[in-house]
């Protein structure tokens, strides 16, 4: 079996976790108490969904997941929510005081008190797996727990499970709106610390998702539940090939192989289509060509940046539902003839396709329409460097005045860590720039670094 363990860290991670597991349960017909009427085999069968759920002798399906937060309120909602019987109480881990939006508290002071307990619980889950494939880690960049504790946990996971893949789903701070003033600090510190421990990181920015909810779903004031359900659909599309049998299945490690040309350049851009409300879907049936085209519209991306300014290095199209390879090939051929989509000259073919016959499921009473087919595109493009540049600029503005730095130093960090992290990200921006150059331009100067 190729099991995956999901780790949800901090408020953002836990709330996205709720949305994801709610959706997985609906997709597999698992009830909130963990029973699955359609599953006739008792105990751990060899069904595809066993990658994400373990089965008890009593026929209960338990998610292979851990929820961690340094303060209890958010996880308490899981403990009392609809799906409270789904999880083993030991899978929900909380501390007493939160990280107060402070990376240093999440990584050093408060985080280190709880990290051994968390690793212990993860070890228990890992021991139930016959062939653990890797970890999916959900967190935000901006919060103290999401940034600090995640980076601590990733370092420890690398020690304990060296070669296992670690994929991140990270909530990147939105360009305009912000939930904390110190987001740029936390983001840059966590990116620097986890850069060498993460194999692939899918970034999602709240503002981009707000805009999609407003524009495509006509939700005037999107709530976090609206956002998370949309993120849940995306995560579900990415993991569908692990949980269902399909025509072209894609493995966790396969994502990395096809999307990550150099170890540091592992931040694919995620685009999902169609995001459409029930009223609209009633009147239009979207063809494979239409949803494929929609993926190349910057408006449907999960991070605000413009791929038309960058170059694509690799592209992975994950279709689900009523899709046949013939239509996909035609749609991709059309895309390739359009000159707006530029690939780097050292990666000529760049499209990987996965097809899964399980149509997208939607949460009843949710905002998304039930559609026959959907596609999730993961693309590694140099345009995502815009997102880093934006963040680095905000960091510089604050750091030039050493604003808020004393909160971090007071928790045992050194100022040197800030400049070290900032230099690392400057190098990352440079890496992206070099990758986007034509092979003729920079004659092998970058070659020594890798």
Curated annotation (Swiss-Prot):
Disruption phenotype: RNAi-mediated knockdown eliminates microtubules in fat body cells, resulting in defective nuclear positioning. Tubulin is the major constituent of microtubules, a cylinder consisting of laterally associated linear protofilaments composed of alpha- and beta-tubulin heterodimers. Microtubules grow by the addition of GTP-tubulin dimers to the microtubule end, where a stabilizing cap forms. Below the cap, tubulin dimers are in GDP-bound state, owing to GTPase activity of alpha-tubulin. Dimer of alpha and beta chains. A typical microtubule is a hollow water-filled tube with an outer diameter of 25 nm and an inner diameter of 15 nM. Alpha-beta heterodimers associate head-to-tail to form protofilaments running lengthwise along the microtubule wall with the beta-tubulin subunit facing the microtubule plus end conferring a structural polarity. Microtubules usually have 13 protofilaments but different protofilament numbers can be found in some organisms and specialized cells. Interacts with Ote. GO terms for biological process: lysosome localization; microtubule cytoskeleton organization; mitotic cell cycle. Its cofactor is Mg(2+). Undergoes a tyrosination/detyrosination cycle, the cyclic removal and re-addition of a C-terminal tyrosine residue by the enzymes tubulin tyrosine carboxypeptidase (TTCP) and tubulin tyrosine ligase (TTL), respectively. The gene is alphaTub84B. This is Tubulin alpha-1 chain. It comes from the Eukaryota. One of its GO terms (cellular component) is spindle. The modification N6-acetyllysine is found at residue 40. It comes from Drosophila melanogaster.
